[in-house]
Amino acid sequence: MSAPFVLAVPSKGRLQENAEAFFARAGLTLSKPGGARDYRGTIAGLDNVEVAYLSASEIAANLARGSVHFGVTGEDLVRESITDADKRVLLIDGLGFGYANVVVAVPQAWIDVRTMADLDDVTTGFRAQHNRRMRVATKYINLTRGFFAQHSVVDYRIVESAGATEGAPAVGTAEMIVDITTTGATLAANGLKVLDDGVLLRSQANLVASREADWSDTARETARVILDHIASRARAGKYKEVRTRFKGCNDALLAEAHSRFGVVSPFGGPTSSGMLTLHCPPAQIYALGSFLRQHGADTVSVAALDYVFDKENPLFSKLAAFLPQ
């Protein structure tokens, strides 16, 4: 019996809920046969898949080790915790939740400090005046070092933070911070501001693949099936299905619809009876419906699409190109 294909997802909170909802929308239902407290799960219809419920940081670590094939975690954790991340893991696709920015934040009282160049000047002056480097509180040690090096800021030292990083300047354990934020409200409440060019990373939850995992033929086929579900759902979300039939429906009219409304005709041009099926961007639905009626259509129906399967699977092609041959 072949080893299971392991998919790691967050074990609690909003991230778990969003991850399970994402897979459910793609027709992949995650469940815990052992109950809510079980840390192992399954996907209906994919018997060789084992779902591992882990913390977001554990998911990144397991991806680096190759003990899971796919994992759902934030790009910030991937970039921070995995050395040479682009060679060891693949960010297959952003999942549309878990948005947050990793930022440099300084006290609002520093009215003359708005950019990283300003910060460079201030840190240099601070060291000359106080004979010590400015302290930066953060849990993003590697991201901070890399970003500060890009901006030639050298007169600082990192104070590792385990939590409540935004409070460090107020209690005197650091002069500034590098932390993650969604709205900036917590930073502002603690008297901090984000530098104009101080965004290290715009992060979101990603589906990530490990190059180090055991990519047997069975594992690759399982990955193809999972990614086929995800790609077909994503493709369906871009369009509504439009149907009509009228005598004046011809190839010239279809070409104009393509040009004006960005539609695609997945099953070719109109039939001999004038029957036509189009996939149309939602924002263009009314304009397309009006256009078709102006040219002779009595009825135009519009329906939501659940899935649109295509011969090509760009997500799996991306993965196949990344994995060892």
Curated annotation (Swiss-Prot):
Q: How does its activity get regulated? A: Feedback inhibited by histidine.
Q: Which cofactor does it need?
A: Mg(2+)
The keyword rRNA processing appears for this protein: no
Q: InterPro entries under this entry?
A: ATP-PRT_HisG_long (IPR020621), ATP_PRibTrfase_cat (IPR013820), ATP_PRibTrfase_CS (IPR018198), ATP_PRibTrfase_HisG (IPR001348)
PROSITE patterns hit by this protein: ATP_P_PHORIBOSYLTR
Associated pathway: Amino-acid biosynthesis; L-histidine biosynthesis; L-histidine from 5-phospho-alpha-D-ribose 1-diphosphate: step 1/9
UniProt-listed GO biological process terms: L-histidine biosynthetic process
Top enzyme category: transferase
GO molecular function annotation: ATP binding; ATP phosphoribosyltransferase activity; magnesium ion binding
**In terms of domain of life, where is this protein from?**
Bacteria
**Keyword set for this entry?**
Amino-acid biosynthesis, ATP-binding, Cytoplasm, Glycosyltransferase, Histidine biosynthesis, Magnesium, Metal-binding, Nucleotide-binding, Transferase
Any single Gene Ontology cellular-component annotation:
cytoplasm
Cell compartment(s), UniProt: Cytoplasm
| EC number per UniProt | 2.4.2.17
Which reaction(s) are listed as its catalytic activity?
1-(5-phospho-beta-D-ribosyl)-ATP + diphosphate = 5-phospho-alpha-D-ribose 1-diphosphate + ATP
Query: PANTHER family, per this entry?
Result: ATP PHOSPHORIBOSYLTRANSFERASE, ATP PHOSPHORIBOSYLTRANSFERASE ATP-PRTASE
The record ties this protein, via NCBIfam families, to: hisG
What is the stated purpose of this protein? Catalyzes the condensation of ATP and 5-phosphoribose 1-diphosphate to form N'-(5'-phosphoribosyl)-ATP (PR-ATP). Has a crucial role in the pathway because the rate of histidine biosynthesis seems to be controlled primarily by regulation of HisG enzymatic activity.
Q: Which family does it belong to?
A: Belongs to the ATP phosphoribosyltransferase family. Long subfamily.
The cross-references to HAMAP family, in alphabetical order and at most eight, read: HisG_Long
Protein name in the entry? ATP phosphoribosyltransferase
Question: What is the organism of origin for this protein?
Answer: Rhodopseudomonas palustris (strain ATCC BAA-98 / CGA009)
**Name of the encoding gene:** hisG
